[in-house]
Design a protein with these regions (language model features):
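Short cysteine clusters
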Residues: 103
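Cys-dependent protein tyrosine phosphatase-like superfamily
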Residues: 1-99, 112-206
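Substrate/cofactor-recognition hotspot
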Residues: 106
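Glycine/aspartate-rich loop-and-adjacent alpha/beta segment that forms the canonical ThDP
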Residues: 109
Length: 206
C-alpha cells in the first residue's frame, strides 16, 4: 500500500524489491522513507552539489542509515555525453539492492534512467516496459519543450546498438553528436538545448 510519503515523493517500484524511482525527498522525511522501503543505495541524478543544502542533507541521511549514496549527473534539457551514461550504468552495476533512482521531481531524468535500467537489466526485450517508464500517469512525466528528446533516445539507442547490450554500446560507440543529428533528421528540432557542457548551478535544476 502506498503511504503519504510515497505520494509526496512520487515513489514507485521499477522492479519490486530491487529498484525504485522517486523525487527529491524534501520536507525532512528522507530517513523514514528510506527505512520504510529498505533502500540500500541511492542514485542521485542531480550530480554532486555540496554547496546546496538538499545535497548535504541527502548525503548525511544516507550515511546515517547505511545507504550508499552515488552521484550521477544527468540534464533533462541537454543531450548526455558518453561519460555521463557510462557513469549511470556503472552505478546500476555497483549499487546494492534495493536501489533508489531520484532526481528533483522524479519525472524526467528519473523516467529516462528507469528506462535505461530495465534495458540494461533485461536486454532489448524490455523495450516496451522501458518506454512505459515515461508514462504521464502514474509517473507525472509531462516533458517540456527541451525535454522531449528523452523518450526518443530509446529508439535511437536500439537502432544504433543493433542488438548489443546497451551498456556495451554506450561505452564503445555512443556519440551525442550522432544523437543530435538523428533527432534533427526526424523532425525533433527544438527538443533539446544542445549537448551537455556543464551544470548551470540552479538549486532547483540540480
Amino acid at each position: 500500500m502506498r503511504g503519504p510519503s510515497d505520494v509526496l515523493y512520487n515513489f514507485h517500484w521499477i522492479v519490486p524489491g530491487e529498484a525504485a524511482r522517486a523525487a527529491q525527498a524534501y520536507a525532512g522525511f528522507l530517513g523514514p522513507f528510506l527505512t520504510r522501503h529498505g533502500i540500500k543505495s541511492l542514485i542521485n541524478l542531480r550530480g554532486p552539489n555540496p554547496k546546496f543544502g538538499w545535497w548535504r542533507y541527502e548525503r548525511r541521511i544516507s550515511e546515517a542509515h547505511g545507504v550508499r549514496h552515488i552521484d550521477v549527473m544527468l540534464d533533462s534539457r541537454h543531450l548526455p555525453r558518453r561519460d555521463m551514461l557510462v557513469a549511470l550504468f556503472d552505478a546500476f552495476d555497483s549499487a546494492p539492492r534495493p536501489l533508489l533512482i531520484k532526481c528533483s521531481g522524479g519525472q524526467d531524468r528519473t523516467s529516462f534512467a528507469a528506462a535505461l535500467y530495465l534495458i540494461h537489466r533485461d536486454g532489448w526485450v524490455a523495450r516496451e516496459k522501458a518506454l512505459a517508464q515515461f508514462a504521464r500517469f502514474p509517473y507525472l512525466h509531462f516533458p517540456k519543450q527541451h525535454q522531449r528528446w528523452l523518450q526518443p533516445f530509446i529508439a535511437f539507442a536500439a537502432g544504433e546498438a543493433a542488438g548489443r547490450p546497451i551498456a556495451e554500446w554506450t561505452r564503445d560507440s555512443y556519440d551525442p553528436a550522432r544523437l543530435k543529428n538523428w533527432l534533427e533528421e526526424r523532425g525533433h528540432h527544438g527538443t533539446f538545448k544542445g549537448i551537455f557542457e556543464r551544470p548551470v548551478g540552479s538549486r532547483w535544476q540540480w
